[in-house]
Amino acid sequence: MKLMSWRRSRPDGTDATPSSPMKKILILTAGYGEGHNSAARALQSAFNENPAVEAELIDLFALRAPRLNNFSRRAYVKVINTAPKIWSAIYGWLDRSPLVPLTFKALGSHRELLGRLIAEKKPSAICSTYPIYAWLLNDLRHRGHQFCPHYTIITDALTINSLWFRTPSAGWFVTDPDSGAVLCTRGIPSEQVHVSGFPVALAFANRRPEWQPPELTRTTRRKILFMINSGRSHALQIARALLQHRDWEITFTAGRDLALQQELKNLAIGAPAQATVLGWTDDIPELLMTHHVVISKAGGATTQESINAYCPLLVSQIVPGQEEGNYELIRRHEAGALTETPQAIVTTLQRIFASDAAIWQHWRANLQRFAQPAAARTIATTVLSKSAEIGD
């Protein structure tokens, strides 16, 4: 493997730093839920801010068996959205059953590929945002492989599946103190638990001054962001209800669903509310920071991004298991509400904007106290510091 190096120049352009190998960081992710990938991308950006570090993102499942990975991802999304009780049973079994580790034996080819990648790239540290990797890495160690420390970045809050911590790791990074307490009560030493926050995109830490929602006055339109993740018929029912209010300005994000985009545009024609319909966009940080409220399911990335944008979240859907903890985090910190029907959404919006938006102001202030928008940098700094301590 060819190692990259960097040099610092003097004002006259001559070299002031001897060539030295780049410190390599491997970030392991998977596409089963956007939270894992979102966290991994943020970590990669944070590590790569250091000119002496090169962080590489790897989805082993997509790399080893792309067709199977695409099929299983689609199946996962379909199950959690159309058969939540089945997913709840699966999630509970994964959390409690002592037989779960035996199922990972079917990933032998994934484990061997991971071992080859580590041997080739010789990382100084490994970070993973998906729980299965810790099991594969531990299996490699039992088989005699020797490599750098591995750190687990837990992308769920409060209702944390034991898959995240039932196998060893050099450290665990969690979203909040209560989630840290969950690990400690399950036997993880407190010195290995780091309350860093969820690694959101660096745009949240680098917040531009103009990325603010409009000041709320009697004449200000309330800006509402509706991020549609699943369930077209339910989404259209919510959209119809939102569009009936003249003093609201609605932004819809419909992803890559072109048919849904067109249906939303048709609904918006002549509606009392102002409306903008977006497809897939990478401007989510800006959208969250410039809207007063976001409506969405309680996904890991969406929940944490709303927190770090100081944008109160109305939860329209909860997937049993991991998303229950995400909503509970919002509820405990009084930063949003559960609103699973169009009428509940409309009623809650009217309530939080009443009386000079007193409830909205309270929720936003709570988010500002609770948010950790620089979490990705915190994790990168901690991992690099520990790597230096062991003499890498």
Whereabouts are the PLM-identified features?
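Active-site and donor-binding regions of nucleotide-sugar-utilizing enzymes
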Residues: E34, A89-G187, Q192
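A donor-sugar binding/catalytic signature common to diverse glycosyltransferases
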Residues: E286-G325
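C-terminal alpha-helical cap of glycosyltransferases
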Residues: Q372-D392
